[in-house]
Regions:
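Conserved, single-site charged/polar hotspot
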Residues: 1-477
Length: 477
């Protein structure tokens, strides 16, 4: 039995959700242990049971209870029966570099591929798009979330994934992802960092934890009810993004990732009653906003709603809407050096240079006894100011001084959890609880978009039966 080749996605093959097959990077380690629950094939040899694969010299060695075997550096195991077989990956790291980082064993359907990437081995799962989505919306959120919220997330995740596959085919080196000299360190990250698979399984892309998470009837119903549906803007499938909590206002795409304008990833006030805010790119307005508690969807402490939208480890985070952290100058100096590799010496001042429309800092000036430098974008800032990742870059800085005017404490007071671009998961959960349907939720967070069946997205980027999403008063941008 030969390995099934994954189907690539382009304008001619992406017209059916069943035709799209994905490759997901799951585990990156010097050795990988897995358990095959059923019969799997590599060419004409079959495998079942528990194995460990490691690199010894230039060879990949497969270890089992019956002995060892040299295998190719692209070792693929294809299930004999897609419906009844699955495999376990042991000690998978999730939440990498975030405050919820931990390891767990995970179960997957589909094909398993082990690759030698030099510094480590990579375990890749290959499976159909709709099977992937079943796991994603259970992994990103609680599987007990409301049906309308799950439907909205299914559309977003499907749209984002297909947009990434199309983008990767067209991607050229038209922009830099890092600008660094003596005066600045500006960097942004995205999924094109992955060369040998479409997306990873962690928060860097979308959480994908296999079939380990509970599938409820609502999850399966959400996938079936939206099967093949994508968000479209101006004839293109949307690069739909999401974060946990926008903090009250969503952010521009280009303030977080590459300098590309997506009109549907814009400033949205997370409210059905508040139609405007002050210009949060201005420092004084941002300060007042961050120190306030505006009446917006994501400003909730309703435990029932939060338990329905957040997984167990996400619920360990309580103060996501407004939060604060505090450091001594020496603590902060050591933290920044360890996190981004730049030694500022004794930190003397922290000054926002540029903010986005949500109040998130995109460029931050740090003055120290050894150097004066600007860092950005938001993920670099969040990385620099936390052992994992700061909740968001929408923060103000307050300093405490002793009687000699020496700084004794830096306190960061912030808003939101995540980059704030696109759908706000907690805000969307509140909208669902208030009775908004998934079309209204999508319309609120992605203004100007249309909901379309992928089969109507053809090579000429025209649509057979495009209909606008009913905006339903779900909020204004």
């Amino acid at each position: 039995m030969k390995m099934k080749e994954p189907v690539t996605c382009n304008r001619s093959t992406c017209n059916s959700p069943q035709a799209i097959t994905l490759s997901i990077g799951i585990l990156f380690a010097p050795a990988i242990t897995f358990r095959l629950n059923g019969t799997y094939w590599n060419k004409d040899q079959k495998y079942s049971g528990e194995y460990t694969i490691s690199k010894e010299g230039k060879n990949l060695i497969l270890h089992s209870s019956s002995g060892t075997q040299i295998v190719p550096d692209h070792f693929t195991l294809t299930p004999e029966n897609d419906e009844t077989t699955n495999f376990d990956l042991l000690n998978v790291m999730i939440g990498i570099n975030f405050h919820w980082q931990r390891t767990e064993d995970q179960k997957f359907k589909g094909t398993l591929k082990i690759m030698d990437e030099g510094k480590h081995l990579t375990a890749i799962n290959i499976l159909p798009l709709e099977d992937y989505l079943l796991s994603v919306i259970s992994s990103e959120m609680s599987a007990t979330s409301s049906l309308e919220l799950l439907k909205a997330h299914a559309v977003i995740s499907r749209s984002w994934l297909i947009a990434q596959k199309i983008k990767s085919e067209k991607l050229t080196d038209t922009y830099q992802s890092c600008i660094q000299d003596e005066q600045q360190y500006i960097r942004w990250y995205d999924r094109e960092d992955h060369e040998h698979f479409d997306v990873c399984a962690d928060d860097h892309c979308q959480r994908y934890q296999g079939i380990s998470k509970a599938y409820t009837p609502f999850v399966q119903q959400a996938i079936e009810a939206t099967r093949g549906e994508v968000l479209v803007y101006d004839g293109e499938i949307c690069d739909a993004r999401f974060s946990k909590c926008c903090g009250g206002v969503t952010e521009y795409f280009e303030n977080t990732w590459e300098p590309v304008n997506h009109p549907y990833l814009t400033k949205v006030i997370d409210s059905d009653t508040q139609s405007s805010t002050p210009d949060l790119s201005q420092e004084e307005n941002a300060r007042k906003w961050i120190l306030s508690t505006p009446d917006v969807f994501c400003n909730t402490r309703d435990k029932a709603i939060l338990s329905n939208v957040l997984n167990d480890y996400d619920q360990e985070t309580q103060d996501f809407f407004r939060w604060q952290v505090s450091y001594s100058p020496s603590e902060l100096s050591a933290l920044i050096t360890s996190r981004i590799g730049i030694d500022f010496g004794e930190i003397q001042s922290i000054e926002p240079v540029e903010r986005g429309v949500s109040g998130r800092i995109t460029r931050l000036r740090i003055q120290g006894s050894k150097r004066d430098m600007i860092i950005g974008k938001e993920l670099v800032i969040r990385k620099a100011f936390s052992q994992s990742h700061l909740y968001s870059s929408a923060f103000i800085v307050e300093t405490e001084k002793d009687t000699s005017e020496a700084i004794t404490r830096f306190t960061l007071k912030g808003a939101g959890w995540g980059h704030g671009v696109g759908l706000c998961q907690i805000g969307a959960a509140v909208m669902s609880d208030k009775g908004y349907d998934y079309k209204q939720i999508l319309s609120h967070y992605f203004p100007g978009t249309q909901l379309e069946s992928i089969k109507n997205v053809n090579s000429s980027v025209s649509f057979a039966a495009t209909s606008s999403i009913n905006r339903g008063g779900a909020g204004k941008s």
